[in-house]
Amino acid sequence: MQKNAAHTYAISSLLVLSLTGCAWIPSTPLVQGATSAQPVPGPTPVANGSIFQSAQPINYGYQPLFEDRRPRNIGDTLTIVLQENVSASKSSSANASRDGKTNFGFDTVPRYLQGVFGNARADVEASGGNTFNGKGGANASNTFSGTLTVTVDQVLVNGNLHVVGEKQIAINQGTEFIRFSGVVNPRTISGSNTVPSTQVADARIEYVGNGYINEAQNMGWLQRFFLNLSPM
């Protein structure tokens, strides 16, 4: 009875490991949450006959005469000019060597060792050496260019704008998604309502897709199974 229970436990454990190896690994999106924001409606003014009204209607289309039209409220749009060009390289090397040599001799050889050293003076010499050479290197580069219009979804207490946006492009039977989020200083916004991505704080840029091309880049369940079980 105990033998059958042991076999059952072993088979169950192997089945659990097999299912773990076949499990699909979900990808966590870099830009989370909604990718758009709607303007916040203002309070409704009450006609009480007074010149000063505590609740004034918000005119989102209002533009001062001597001021550029720049985003300042939730729901305003802003164009991000993607200019990401990052490269990094690293190399390392290590060398180590050690040599040793020892000489010693016997003027008199014991009788039971004469068959090994002979009857004459015995000289013994030992030497050894150890050498290690190691090298390593890594190179990485990333280039991303384009434009993406985002929406202000939060106005921070210091006046900075938190923006978020998404662009979807359908090509044949696949869809490409470009998502962006970050914090923009209004002073860096140009007169054409654009700001380079290099001047955006806490920037999150995500470029993903779905369809046959994206599925071809993913590892199959059988390959993941053998990869998890392989000791190499």
Swiss-Prot record:
Residue positions of covalent lipid attachment, annotated as N-palmitoyl cysteine: C22
For molecular function, the Gene Ontology terms on record are: cytoskeletal motor activity
Subunit details for this protein? Answer: The basal body constitutes a major portion of the flagellar organelle and consists of four rings (L,P,S, and M) mounted on a central rod.
* Physiological role: Assembles around the rod to form the L-ring and probably protects the motor/basal body from shearing forces during rotation.
Tell me where the signal peptide lies: 1-21
Q: Name one GO biological process term.
A: bacterial-type flagellum-dependent cell motility
Q: Which family does it belong to?
A: Belongs to the FlgH family.
Q: Which NCBIfam families match?
A: PRK00249.1-1
| UniProt main location, coarse | membrane
User: Lineage from the top down?
Assistant: Bacteria, Pseudomonadati, Pseudomonadota, Gammaproteobacteria, Enterobacterales
Stated membrane topology is: Lipid-anchor
Q: Tell me which species this is from.
A: Escherichia coli O127:H6 (strain E2348/69 / EPEC)
What's the encoding gene here? flgH
Covalent lipid adducts (S-diacylglycerol cysteine), residues: C22
Q: Which domain of life is it from?
A: Bacteria
- Provide one Gene Ontology cellular component: bacterial-type flagellum basal body, distal rod, L ring
The places in or outside the cell where this protein is found are: Cell outer membrane; Bacterial flagellum basal body
InterPro entries named in the record? Flag_Lring
Q: What is the designated name of this protein?
A: Flagellar L-ring protein
> Per its UniProt record, what HAMAP family does this chain match?
FlgH (MF_00415)
Q: Which UniProt keywords apply?
A: Bacterial flagellum, Cell outer membrane, Lipoprotein, Membrane, Palmitate, Signal
